[in-house]
Amino acid sequence: MTGVQTCALPIWASVQLALIKNAARPIPYTKRDNVASDYASRTMYWSGPIVLAFVIFHLLQFTAGVIHPGSQFIEGDVYHNVVAGFQVWWVSAWYIFAVSLLGLHLSHGISAMFQSLGLSHPRYTPLLNKAAVAIAAAIVLGFISVPISVLLQVVK
């Protein structure tokens, strides 16, 4: 699967889900009650477009070299480009914010994946939801360690 397909698939799926949801109940509820939903699931609609914008920015900065605040983009020198990019505070802040949102997005997606695989059971679901949060947190911590290390000058 290509990167474009990877980005397009969740967009297509969310549009399809919204269409099915609206067709099933064209009249909205008078009172919105979020008893069964968690914060991650309630933020999917707005975190998705922000994560997409982040992916586009990330590709333009680190792959295409179109955006290179702070210094010159050097084709093929990934180490230089990453360090130079993350030395700009707002790039690091944007990256940390977006990856944190990605973590919320992933925790919901991983939890939904377990349910889609039929692993939903009153005994196992709470453990699987905690596993989804732990997996997403590990991914977030791994990815944000890079800009934090550059900002703290651990990586130069």
What are these regions (language model features)?
Residues 15-39, 66-73, 110-130, 154-155:
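Membrane-interfacial helix termini and the short, flexible loops that connect transmembrane helices
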Residues 18, 43-72:
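Transmembrane alpha-helix/helix-exit interface in multi-pass inner-membrane proteins
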Residues 142-156:
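Juxtamembrane boundary at the C-terminal end of a transmembrane helix
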Residues 61, 87-109:
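Alpha-helical transmembrane segments of helical membrane proteins, especially in multi-pass transport
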Residues 2-3, 7-9:
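Short, small-residue-biased leader/transition segments that mark boundaries at the very start
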Residues 10, 58, 105:
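Divalent metal-coordination and catalytic microenvironments
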Residues 32-53, 127-140:
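Interfacial and helix-entry/exit segments of alpha-helical transmembrane bundles
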Residues 64-88:
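Membrane-interface interhelical connector segments
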